């Protein structure tokens, strides 16, 4: 048997076809292509949203942000700010988009303050549907919101009416993960009491938050235990900080108080590591739920309405426009085929002339 032939045979395992290598192929292709993920953060100002996001991904997404004064907040409207950063770790690339909502809950009158957020989420679904309906679908950018961290104030006794209204308005569109901010302002007993109160009110109002899937029966025991702990930690109580301080002879990220140090990455102090673990280990599931549940619900509703018209960033997209775009793409493809045929004819004629 030749050396070249031996490369394509496997005498040691008769009957082996090679399908077992398919996951490796998918893995290599995914690593080359990279991953896309969009995270939305919503909550009142002063709850440490920006600090937490920077702590989670060890980057500064808001280097030029200006914090508004108290007078500016009285009539402030909700802005939508999307920041995209390319993160690479051990050869794996992640295109992370963080959608912030400065101004949410800040104004004296917060009625309908979450409507711009709903419009943004719907616009991303609409854009994806429009791109998916085109002929060139190879390079569709997925800007749909895959997860929403909803920040709850630790200074109340549970959910505010605005919290309930927002989550009920968004829970059928986005995977909502409730987060109790500034956990260092609460004692351990207060923390557990607030967690139970928030969960009870979420159930009472019929709010659907993101449910972590159960671990498969063939998963190892460590992963099963990790999944159980993550589920038991919802809503996550977190502390964020980008400052390095010295504690017990080592540098840690945390906050220094007269009574001691709160370490960001210490599970005994807060749920920061659990939140990050949940996001990283369930990133694929968050994307799948977005695709299979939230986007499909949106798409079904659009199809029922006949996709008569909609707005994608204030640009009207109608059936006629979609048909025109498809016709234009078909014309371009036909022109390309015609040019290729003409070139082949010229080459064929020149070849015949040489033989003569």
UniProtKB/Swiss-Prot annotation:
Biological process according to GO: cilium assembly; cytoskeleton-dependent cytokinesis; protein localization; smoothened signaling pathway
Region of interest: G1 motif: 43-50
Alphabetically ordered keywords of this record: Cell cycle, Cell division, Cell membrane, Cell projection, Cytoplasm, Cytoskeleton, GTP-binding, Membrane, Mitosis, Nucleotide-binding
Binding residues annotated for GTP, in chain numbering: 43-50, 77, 103, 182-190, 240, 255
Residue ranges of domain Septin-type G in the record: 33-305
Region of interest (Important for dimerization), ranges: 259-269
G4 motif: annotated span: 181-184
UniProt similarity note: Belongs to the TRAFAC class TrmE-Era-EngA-EngB-Septin-like GTPase superfamily. Septin GTPase family.
Name of the protein this chain belongs to: Septin-2A
